[in-house]
């Protein structure tokens, strides 16, 4: 299911429109998550960017995305089989700090699970983000039963400060910037 979201944050990407979907343009055994953006209100769209960064021909599917409207950072969650065999499935979260030009991928599920056709699980994933706290939620099969999982991610990465001029001295084995 494709999704669309608008950046209304006070970031450099304010006004951007984003779209995310899955397709099999790389083969029927390689479903991937794709992303496109518009900077002009939807008149023109960027070429499709593959969000999942694996080098496999495995499936990634059922994505959901959001924008932390306090930072403009895009977050997403999807099911992923890059590290597994058969139908065993993991859950990955993605992050873009550059308005959707690139995505960092990281696994959030503690272990893989194997879906079955007798238990529907796909529409039960989502992600919310606010003020550098991210809440991906997903469902999985646990001992034959559908269970819901959430992890709380605190995005506390600090931005390095660029020094234009400084001096340093060593005092008792410590470097002091002045």
Where on the chain are the PLM-derived regions?
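Pro/Thr/Ser/Gly-rich low-complexity, intrinsically disordered linker/stalk tracts
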Residues: 157-178
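Extracellular, repeat-based ectodomains that mediate carbohydrate processing or recognition
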Residues: 1-157
């Amino acid at each position: 299911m494709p999704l669309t979201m608008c950046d209304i944050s006070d970031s450099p990407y304010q006004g951007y429109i984003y779209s995310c979907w899955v397709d099999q343009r790389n083969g029927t055994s390689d479903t991937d998550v794709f992303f496109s953006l518009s900077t002009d209100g939807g008149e023109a769209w960027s070429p499709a960017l593959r969000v999942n960064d694996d080098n496999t021909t495995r499936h990634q599917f059922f994505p959901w995305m959001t924008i932390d409207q306090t930072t403009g950072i895009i977050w997403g969650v999807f099911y992923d089989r890059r590290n597994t065999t058969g139908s065993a499935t993991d859950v990955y979260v993605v992050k873009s700090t550059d308005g959707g030009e690139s995505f960092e991928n990281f696994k959030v599920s503690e272990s893989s699970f194997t879906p079955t056709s007798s238990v529907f699980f796909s529409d039960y994933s989502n992600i919310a983000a606010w003020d550098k706290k991210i809440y991906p939620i997903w469902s999985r099969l646990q001992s034959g039963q559908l269970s819901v999982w959430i992890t709380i991610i605190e995005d506390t990465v600090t931005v390095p400060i660029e020094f234009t001029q400084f001096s340093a001295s060593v005092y008792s084995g410590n470097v002091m910037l002045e």
